[in-house]
């Protein structure tokens, strides 16, 4: 430890906080074990004193209470030591945490300084100006490419006049379709066309039917041998 204050090894300086924290935790653990042991001895002497009081052994009871008081005094000292070490441990852990935080911040500041050393505000402004110029150039190129070709000399007034003529023509055609067509005059109907049509009767049809019946009768008679 004295080497730390009088320029000892740098590695030992770095490891000293961690080593102190470990040693403090181990010693606090040892004191807690001692505390539990003293508490148990106090309880044993208290029970022994109660036993002697019950058996009317006053002298032995006083001796047990005396030993209990001794253990109680030692227990109080141990508890105070534990409290002191715990306070110191918390302080060292906090200081060590602050140290590690400062190291990280210092390393971060060093990295930022290295990064910013490669450019400054003027360089950033120059870069932004170059970007703006390139964006404007890209817009001009895009506009030139998308501009229509061959329609620069079209007369807009002439187009409007032609459009009006087409609209007037369409309106005129629409009005013509709305005028009802004249009904055709009815043609005179002849007398014959006015009379109802009846199917013509074939007067020779019964003769044909009679001949067929006669032939059928003759065939039947021949078949029967008549």
Curated annotation (Swiss-Prot):
Residues 168-226 are annotated as: Disordered. Transmembrane segments: none annotated. GO terms for cellular component: cytoplasmic side of plasma membrane; ESCRT III complex; multivesicular body. It is found in: Cytoplasm; Endosome membrane. Keywords: Coiled coil, Cytoplasm, Endosome, Membrane. Pfam families: Snf7. It comes from the Eukaryota. Residues 168-179 have a biased composition (Basic and acidic residues). One of its GO terms (biological process) is cellular response to pH. Its main location: cytoplasm. Gene3D superfamilies: 6.10.250.1710, ESAT-6-like. It is a peripheral membrane protein. Residues 18-182 form a coiled coil. A component of the endosomal sorting required for transport complex III (ESCRT-III). Required for the sorting and concentration of proteins resulting in the entry of these proteins into the invaginating vesicles of the multivesicular body (MVB). Also required for the proteolytic cleavage of the transcription factor RIM101 in response to alkaline ambient pH. Belongs to the SNF7 family. This is Vacuolar-sorting protein SNF7. The lineage of its organism: Eukaryota, Fungi, Dikarya, Ascomycota, Saccharomycotina.
